Amino acid sequence: VSHLYLVMDFLPGGDFMSLLMKKDILNEEESRFYVAEMILCIEAVHELGCIHRDLKPDNLLIGKDGHLQLSDFGLSKMAENKLFPLSSSNQSNNSTENNYSQLSPRQKELTKTNHNELHSKYQAQRKNRLWAYSTVGTPDYIAPEVFGNKGYGQEVDWWSVGVILFEMMVGYPPFFADTPSDTCQKIIKWEKYFNIPLDAKLSTNATSLIKAMVAPAEKRLGLNGAEESKKHPFFKNFDWKAVKNLKPPFIPEIKNDWDTKYFDKFEETDPFYPRENRVSKH
């Protein structure tokens, strides 16, 4: 065998991050549809006995029909036992209880940024896709227990869903900071930093759902399965069995099967897209 061919679905609508960049903030009806599809995606992964571990807007792709599909299973693991952090030997002394019982001066400084300032900074940063590609991993959606030394399970994916819902409705992730290191500090001491700004004007049910997911692992909504989330008042009268038949808020306008207008355009000198890997347009 000299060649290996991978046959995959082509999802021409781009990724969900691109949609968020375009829309900035989604209304409650739009957010309800997309978070419902995310819940179904994670439910399917968990039913296979897996943990996705890398749920973020960039890994949610939009199909020709406008529906979401989950991608990038490079960090996924089977959930037979509790998993330990990415580097437990290095992180063993970094548990939330042991090392961050008091906020450092730098951490206290992080709490002072207001809603409008965070929103503006995040909008500028996420529009810089080259910056995004050059960053090895994004910590914004990682659950706090991943940084600890007690292990974790499928509940980490539900934290990520809550963070993405917050971003959809507020305009930035709840623990966004100027640097990945500062973001990690915020997540580790999340109870000190987590706040839903009144300026965002979220409904009671939306606020309740976010707080139920961005919560301690042992109390997190979804810990006992996706049905917990489906029964939340935020989804009152939502027809879970008909999701695939619902019209998505955004449907890509595709001219033909080769239309890639919803994908990032790479420059000729882009180091992340070598010339030899490009497909000729002719």
What is the predicted role of each segment?
Residues 2-15:
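Conserved short submotifs of the Hanks-type protein kinase catalytic core
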Residues 17-26:
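AlphaC helix of the protein kinase catalytic domain
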Residues 34-35:
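Activation segment signature within eukaryotic-like protein kinase domains
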Residues 40-50:
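Protein kinase catalytic-loop region centered on the HRD/HxD motif
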Residues 84-124, 222-282:
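C-terminal regulatory tails of eukaryotic serine/threonine kinases
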Residues 127-131, 145-155:
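Conserved end of the kinase activation segment
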